[in-house]
């Protein structure tokens, strides 16, 4: 009886590990003001355990002509092609579905923000919060996983 109980307990205790997802993969970025798709970002894990996100696709939108280069961006992003640009850097997994300590670049404005991210329970949405100083002074976006 004890072995049966222990087996069931261990099964449920470790089941979340087998279903755990991380943020690696391709994500559709969505304009937080209009809801229109902006492009795709591929998030990969670096050898030091941090996560980096690179623009892999720019989605054409009515009334918007995307920039080809990161004109107003600080070094090391200045005058680099936007396609292939690392817009997320140094993001670290903190616990469970939470990621912190990263930086995110807005290639349209050239501004770099501190970044936190939280993966949804089903792993299909990534809630990003870019901010300066404190998280209250920031902006949020929800990205959708591309399958």
Where are these regions (language model features)?
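Edge beta-strand at a domain terminus
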Residues: 123-125, 131-147
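Short aromatic-glycine motifs in intrinsically disordered, low-complexity regions
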Residues: 73-79, 127-134
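Cleavable N-terminal signal peptides
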Residues: 7-8, 18
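Bacterial N-terminal signal peptides that target proteins for export
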Residues: 1-6
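Sec/Tat signal peptide C-region and signal peptidase I cleavage site
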Residues: 14-20
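Cleaved targeting-peptide boundary
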Residues: 20-28
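Central antiparallel beta-sheet cores of small beta-barrel/beta-sandwich binding domains
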Residues: 29-115
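C-terminal terminal-subdomain/extension
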Residues: 112-119, 125-126, 131
């Amino acid at each position: 009886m004890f072995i049966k109980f222990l087996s069931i307990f261990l099964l449920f205790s470790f089941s979340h590990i087998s279903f755990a997802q991380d943020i690696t993969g391709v994500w559709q970025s969505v304009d937080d003001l209009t809801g229109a798709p902006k492009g795709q970002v591929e998030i990969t894990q670096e050898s030091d355990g941090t996560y980096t996100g690179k623009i892999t696709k720019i989605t054409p939108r009515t009334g918007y002509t995307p920039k080809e280069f990161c004109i107003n961006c600080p070094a090391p992003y200045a005058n680099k092609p936007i396609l292939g640009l690392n817009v997320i850097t140094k993001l670290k997994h903190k616990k469970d579905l939470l990621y912190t300590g990263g930086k995110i670049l807005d290639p349209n404005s050239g501004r770099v923000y501190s970044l936190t991210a939280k993966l949804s329970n089903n792993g299909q949405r990534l809630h990003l919060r870019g901010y300066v100083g404190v998280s209250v002074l920031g902006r949020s976006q929800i990205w959708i996983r591309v399958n």
